[in-house]
């Protein structure tokens, strides 16, 4: 063991390097991340350069606006409502105003009739609407006589230079008549109420703008947009950060934590990297802000710190959201939405003055705090006298407080992320109490605490004593792992699920322990609990007296433990070496030992040749080896391995077994597996778990003796054998022997274990019967598979192929009946009820369309994108419509003193001030002042008249009272920053005069705006089409690119193999895609019509034009997308990129083909040549073509209209033809004649093999002779179903140099074999032996370089129609149900609907899939998926079936069901099957014959017993003694009886030997000797077993080909036997 110290710094640096490598290796993601960021920065820079305006205004002098009655405008009329005596009286007095002479005044009954009044738009209408006698509002057309904005923003310019003088916006009230109309109406109201005329007093009011100090103002809306884009400037970086973190937390962080990863190292690694990214963007944004003068007076460092702290707060916010939200995309989306929403909320600080408490509370939202900070900088710029400097305490308080809040936000989000990470339930069940931080145990680790056994931890199941083998004396006291009453519960959909139910046993140092059980038994849960990945519900687990569930002991446990979880643990963007180096540092291996340890692991697992390959490019088996390598880093004392050899070929699996055996001494190795032979060969102790409970535990010998069904006697026969006679002979010696398997070449019997004393006589008689057709025989012990099935309550003898293949002898008639029924169901011939030709094409078309509809319905992401784009297409129209609705509805803006002036006793509040009143009458104005105070205004009175109102810029407004006491005159001065100041002061003066006359009433004036309807809809229906048609063109990639995923999942290849017509596939897709796309287009047109202002008839006419164009456009664009998806089928789907491409192309040609500039001919050409532009081009032709253009082209208008309508249909036919050509020349060969595409099956020419067979095994030579004879025979009925003759396949390899000779790689060399009717031939070989290439040549995916393939007597499979193929991967649609899959393949293979229902029902019942028919495939277990793939392969009764690893991933029970089904499907039928597998037990159970490939050649072929006898080198002898003292004498006797015996295991009670075949033969003599040993030494039990097929395969796989692939094709083959390893 290596020393391991978990160091935070080492882990953080390792993860940081990993993150940088991720950015470098995943260039596409990094490019998009920075591209979006830089584009946003460039856009902000462009916005600031072109649109942003900064007004650096100098000091502005007083502007005199003159008297109110100076207004003189004749181009208006007045309209008032409602019509009453009071309003008539008021308006009659208004008519007496000087500026009203000769003006028309119109009365309306109410406001509604006023709006309906047909006015001449050339004359401005001043609308006066009275609420009551004292309240009214003046209503003007939008933008007429009053400013467009309701109020100045604090950062906008109140005055702008024009013709060398400053023009202030508030002057419009004075100069364009609003104040004049207001004064006249107010005078009329006062005179009506008081009978005193004040017309002269109000008409003589003099207005002026106050002197204004210098100011810096921003340019309105552009500034708002600029700030908004500053808020989202980090969005791209933060989005990818949140996605990356959420992905790692979801898949890797917990697994790395059980290897010792510190949480803080994980967060720091991402923080440091993205802090650097934030730093770069913050510098760039700060430079733009300063260069664009968005902030002028504030220093660069302050702006930079504002951006930097804001970016850092977003980093920690992404940490928090990644903890709360588990989906990567949703995390990124949520952060973006929160950033936009909170940032937009911050604009209230720019426009409104919020209460301090509310503003500082909202600053806990960092985007709000950032927007507030930007607003503060802009406000401080607004006054030249203020400045921001970090060293200036007087002016920098607010911005310093904002910076502090951003830092506080970052820390707060980080603390919350760490807190919620602790208390939220993790994937594996970790969760702390919400108040965990209040417990002292969290902060202070307990020292020297010893484990106390609690009452609920004591094992309480004494009934298991008989099922547990006693531990050998040498292991007593070496209990390394102690499991006490372990229970684990999960919360499932239907309540709590008990994964472990009171499990309790010990695991010992120096032993390899295997955990066995069915799927869902609790093996993985137990491994996760032992590793600390999943905490137990109750009970305890201790590893070397350290409690796994105690956090205090976690470091001690982690430093001695290595874990290989069920899922692969590696980063795909790192190489093998980099992955090992990363995890070595995480595990705390000392830095100077890391490289040495990594190199050692690479050597141990033989991965030196792949050490520089990215993990994502490794095969499944190589990834598994890498995960195991990560587990054994640091040579841990405890190894916990969850299915460590899953997906490995037998040779690699065997090497790992040897590695684990070498590391067994002084260590604890626990592994789970569903591969019983692995447990039998590798494990010293097997622990069976069933439904979370311990079933039994012990050595193989103990388990087989107690639960085994007996010895297997296998006989290899020839044609002269009489099976009946052999059975009689066996039963004469052992009456209770059972025949389990019978075929032409073999018989298999089960002999009870207790009858070993009868074996010598039986084998002696068998040796004498060699002339009766017995070529060879062998004996093997019961397997752990049989033990497993018996423990699960099922007998392998009853569940295997007993009676399916021939004669069945079973203890129960019920089992016999069920198995015979299964054989009848699976061998059912449905070929007579199939359809063909156009009827089959129509059936396939409907089936594909149905599946396409279901797929589209379940593709939520694509549907959401389509709906989003659909909505986006109408955003401009909707906004236009909303603007109209908002402005069409009259709104009032109340004008009151509280807008600008404080009330008495009110504390100072920016921007309110006192109202300055200056008395220059020379007498008292107490009555007027009293009337002002009665309005609730705080006054600042200058009774002596020494102050000048126009010089007082600190006030919002000032009133100077002139004249005499009874003939007062007024002068008003306004601060230009207060937009509505003049109307407010006019109301104040009017109410003051009203108060002088002792009236308590108050006049209230409101300003109002009306939006004229004629201002909307200026461009007609085509203006809206310019928005929605480009978006519509961008929708097709999201609808019609499903074939790419079908191709990548190999579903298309499976469909072609099953006999699907290519044209039926594409047309079936189009049958759904085109109507859906047309429906979207139609809805867009309907929405366009809804927003249109045209009359109903015009709308219907435009729809009649658009609909036929849209049908053709939908068809052409969908098929164009099909062509694109076919061409780029091997790449990514990239729907978004193609959508963007279609959008840009359409917009470009809309701009480029402006008919007024380029003419009709260019428009017609672009419409024809650019399919995405076709729809809008056709509509433009209909809507814009003039008669002059028609005459110029020399044709009639009707013909042009027809041509425009025809263009999309011509595109559709063109793309349909292109798709047909692509299918014909680029796709694999078709198995049927396509009636639409007219594609016929292509026959491959027979090319003679240039290489002679050379030296071959005699069985291989005989098979080659049989293959040649089968090809030559003319009798079709006698031909095998598969004939592979002299197959050779060469691949052209890549070269590193441009002019070097291309190297040839030969995958297969001169392969010849045949599969007879009713036969299952197993094709075995290690990875790279050529199995997959051979299968590809048989299916037609790969064309042989030489040789021929005949399927059921016809070369190339032309007459076959379809193949049955069960690939290794589950080529299924995850979002479709089992029933939908079955119905599709039944239709594709030609079964009529009525017959398909019956066939599907029978197959589903036979394979026990009834409960899963309506379940989605993604919810199924691996075993059910494999069953479904098998059913799909045999559906339709195909004569040729190819089975590639049919039972991979299934538990032993599921495997037995699958093997039984395979045997029942092919035995005694006209069908044949070729099966490839890495699982030798599967080959033994299913195959009639086995062919083993080595380096592209057939090494051997024959029955299993024949290969065992011919290539098996050893027998395995196991003996268990009762007392240790017998070991040495027994060993001496064994060596005397079997001189070449090699001892394998050295335990005190268990003795294991390898016996060469020479020492064992004859078997009768070997068993005679063993029986004598049993009697003389009082053995508890013994077993003698022949080499398994696994061991034969391993021996043959050691032979490696030495040919250089660059040699000529006729080079000879050399074989080398590598050094023998232990088996």
From Swiss-Prot:
It is found in: Membrane. It comes from the Eukaryota. Its main location: membrane. Keywords: ATP-binding, Glycoprotein, Membrane, Nucleotide-binding, Repeat, Translocase, Transmembrane, Transmembrane helix, Transport. ATP 2 binds at residues 1325-1332. SUPFAM superfamilies: P-loop containing nucleoside triphosphate hydrolases. Glycans are attached at residue 120. One of its GO terms (molecular function) is ATP binding. ATP 1 binds at residues 517-524. It is a multi-pass membrane protein. Transporter that may play a role in monocyte differentiation and lipid transport and homeostasis. This is ATP-binding cassette sub-family A member 9.
